[in-house]
């Protein structure tokens, strides 16, 4: 699942992984405070969920979304990646340093799959 500016990087990673034989999907989380219960039921049944965001990994959507999945009975593997180093977020050139480029997202997915 991706939100905001991380979406296109996550899409690139998902396309490359699917082409190489690792079958994964991608969900665009368009709103931070509203949950689509039909989609949440599908995610609860998934073997793993990775949240990719351009916000701080400690305070962004990922930490909150993981809690919402647990409330609904999620038992799979979970991780969230986002900005994690002071002073190196914002510009696309810095996303690789944060692990938020296509390669970093692919590595995070493979670690869960």
What does each model-found stretch correspond to?
Residues 1-113:
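Thiamine diphosphate
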């Amino acid at each position: 699942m991706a939100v905001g500016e991380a979406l296109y990087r996550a899409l690139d990673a998902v396309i490359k992984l699917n082409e190489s034989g690792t079958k994964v999907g991608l969900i665009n989380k368009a709103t931070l405070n509203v949950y689509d219960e039909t989609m949440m039921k599908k995610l609860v049944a998934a073997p793993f969920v990775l949240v990719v965001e351009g916000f701080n990994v400690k305070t962004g959507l990922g930490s909150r979304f993981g809690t919402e999945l647990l409330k609904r009975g999620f038992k799979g593997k979970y991780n969230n990646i986002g900005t994690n180093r002071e002073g190196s977020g914002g510009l696309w050139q810095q996303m690789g340093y944060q692990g938020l480029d296509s390669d970093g997202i692919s590595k995070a997915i493979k670690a869960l799959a």
